[in-house]
Amino acid sequence: MHYLDNASTTRVTRSAANAALDAMLNRFGNPSSVHSLGIEAEGIISRARKELADALGCKPQEIYFTSGGTEADNLAVIQGAELQKRKGRHIITTSIEHPAVINAMKYLASNGFEVTFLSPEKDGTVSLEAFEQSVRRDTVLVSMMLCNNETGAFQPVAEAVRLFREKNPDGLFHTDAVQAFMKQRFDVRSLGVDLLSVSSHKIHGPKGAGALYVRGGVKMKPLLHGGNQESGLRSGTEAVPAIAGFGEAVREARADLQNNMEKIDRLRGRLIAGLARLPKVELIAVGSAIITLAVPKYPTEVIIRLLESRNIFVSGGSACSRGKSSHVLEAMKVQPNLIKSSVRVSLSWHNTDEDIDALLLALEEIA
């Protein structure tokens, strides 16, 4: 099998799976319980929290576990806006965000907030000049993803934060870092953000776990009310097995981050060089670990099925927008015929040269 859909989800590593299984079978206490099994479960969460904090360059108490990236995004955007609404009701985001952010913004727009959606340039990045011109005195929240989930384009988040602070030092800045986490080096201090979302299943951890970084001093209100878990921000008994696997996946990836980044760079270079020899395949966008291409001869779903018949797995864009035309490529003003024939190839450090070569051979055969 040649799995090249790692921006949708990743195969869980043996080590992360074992950590989750151990938590399910042997350390199954409720982390809120005061007996030894509960204390042991709480210890698993604390260790995972520290792994994430070390990876993001923050304090453990600034990490809050969620059910995934979508919940983390919603918590940041909706509750961030609610926290700031007495200061203003203007929000800035981009038109190429993940649906978790786009739809949270639409919800806020229907509840009295004014949302500015910035369109990207042809390379998929947002103009800093356009961003700066959009910032107003009543702009209380910005959400700009760090790495796009369809094109792999990195947004100038740190620079945007600086421009935002110059005009509105009390506003909140959120970034969805789900696709960037453990694929590029960054930390919350150098980015300067107040809120940052990550997800377990995009880094070879189990599904059902994510995390939100909340800068110390930012007093977020919860979306869920109950037993006051996660310091009151996210009630509900924590999914200890998923969190255990998440923490182990972070530990593994962080331990070999430089080699992993170099491997992805090499695989991407191999793919780009091979695509240059295929004139009937159009290259739409190239990111650090994501390549978007088109085979104009076929619609997207047919390309996916033809590749699947050769045991190669890719996607047609965001797995969370199945069956819909790519709002990201539309915002980039990609030709409609290419959008209808586009597929996304997303790499992991677990991919091999054989995966790339199999894809290139298959594209040559079907193009």
Regions found by a protein language model. Name each.
Residues 1-367:
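Pyridoxal 5′-phosphate
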